[in-house]
Regions:
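N-terminal subdomain of nucleotide-sugar transferases
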Residues: 1-39, 215-218
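Donor nucleotide-sugar binding/catalytic pocket of nucleotide-sugar-dependent glycosyltransferases
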Residues: 117-120, 142-183, 188-190
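Conserved donor-binding/catalytic core segment of Leloir-type glycosyltransferases
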Residues: 148, 186-218, 227-230
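Nucleotide-activated donor-binding/catalytic signature segment of Leloir-type glycosyltransferases, i.e.
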Residues: 237-257
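Aromatic "clamp/platform" in nucleotide-sugar-dependent glycosyltransferases that forms part
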Residues: 278
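Short hydrophobic beta-strand element within catalytic cores of glycosyltransferases
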Residues: 294-298
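A charged, aromatic-enriched C-terminal amphipathic alpha-helix characteristic of glycosyltransferases
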Residues: 318, 332-365
Length: 365
């Protein structure tokens, strides 16, 4: 997925390794993420190249493959493999890159070629419940030699679907937190008067439930500033309506309008963070909140139990009453600085850039 910051952050870890990367687009976007563009034009030990004409065929072939079960991109990927003879094909994400790899290699996988697939977010946890996707996932996982995921949960799910190969160490797919990230000044918990809400609503995101909980808690939350970030249009509209009705100070940021650093700086002054989703792998926002001292309120579908216990709040049902209770509990947890300190130590020990990179560098051995 050439437009993905997650792809770019994964690849940047290998910039000083003697590896030749040939990038094949799996998403319909002609845009290449700026971070990835820098790799393509860089001069480190690793080389990063796009498959010839990749910027031009990504969209039209994706459209055709919607009706042809990935025939066109699968055929093209097969030709690319025959021409360039890679030692590893690594599918970063399953429903696009993985399924295209399946079409290219099913019944025609060279014995010398290693197929590695990486589960992103909801790739298995959500899609396994749909029969057509489950069948494809089973075929792909039985073909794969190696599998990586962000959650131990998803390793178990892959095994249940027939994967018998090498399970790589569980790490965040997008890399870890740098020294510069950890150097961002953190506001003292007692001085924090901001609540951060992830603003995505649609497919699996449920930001509107968060906002409805805020509406019903308006009296309790007077004095707090609510920041709704990464919000789609309908969420921006609802936030404005609730602010007008309740008098709460609600600041909004549309999807893609905040940089990574700005998001971290927001969490560095937030008392709690609320993120609701029907399905996810690791929630990157949850990790960012934990790194910056904001107590997380996260749906249990995001493997949050693998990252915090009593220093955060897991939401087990996405209803307004449940979210209201979770917000109240998180605000109480935020009163004890030890909870934020515990979360920060978890991030430093499991998600620092140095540690994640050290593990990632073993993937292509």
């Amino acid at each position: 997925m050439l437009d993905s910051i997650h792809s770019a952050r994964w690849l940047v870890q290998f910039g000083e390794q003697d590896i030749d990367f040939l990038l094949f687009p799996s998403s319909p976007h002609r845009r290449v993420h700026p971070e990835l563009e820098r790799l393509l034009s860089g001069s480190g030990a690793a080389t990063f190249r796009l498959v010839p004409l990749a910027r031009y065929f990504a969209l039209p072939l994706w459209v055709l493959d919607k009706f042809a079960n990935n025939f066109f991109r699968g055929s093209l990927l097969r030709q690319v493999i025959r021409k360039f003879k890679p030692s590893i094909v690594h599918a970063l994400e399953l429903q696009n890159a993985g399924y295209v790899s399946l079409r290219a290699l099913s019944n025609q996988k060279p014995k010398s070629l290693k197929l590695m697939v990486t589960n992103w977010g909801s790739d298995i946890f959500w899609f396994q419940r749909f029969p057509k996707h489950k069948a494809k996932l089973q075929q792909l996982l039985q073909l794969a030699d190696a599998y990586s995921a962000e959650c131990e949960r998803d390793v178990v799910l892959a095994r249940n679907l027939g994967f018998t190969g090498q399970a790589m160490p569980v790490i965040p797919n997008a890399g870890g937190f740098s020294e510069a990230d950890f150097a961002i000044p953190l506001l003292d918990p007692s001085e924090r008067k901001t609540i951060a809400l992830k603003g995505y609503h649609g497919w699996v995101g449920k930001a509107k439930v968060s906002l409805e909980a805020v509406r019903e808690m308006a009296e309790e939350l007077q004095g707090y500033k609510i920041i709704v970030y990464s919000a789609n249009r309908s969420v921006l509209k609802l936030a404005k309506q609730i602010s007008k009705q309740t008098g709460l100070e609600i600041e909004t940021f549309g999807k893609g309008t905040m940089s990574h650093k700005q998001v971290l700086e927001m969490f560095a002054k937030s008392k709690i963070y609320v993120g609701l989703s029907e399905s996810d792998g690791i929630s990157t926002s949850m990790l960012e909140a934990m790194a910056m001292g904001a107590i997380p309120v996260q749906t249990s579908t995001a493997c949050c139990d693998e990252w915090f216990g009593d220093s955060g709040v897991a939401v087990h049902e996405i209803t307004v009453p449940a979210v209201k209770n979770a917000i109240r509990e998180a605000l109480k947890l935020a009163e004890d600085p030890a909870n934020a300190e515990k979360n920060l130590e978890t991030i430093k020990s499991r998600a620092s850039a140095e540690m994640v990179k050290k593990i990632a560098l073993t993937f292509y051995d």
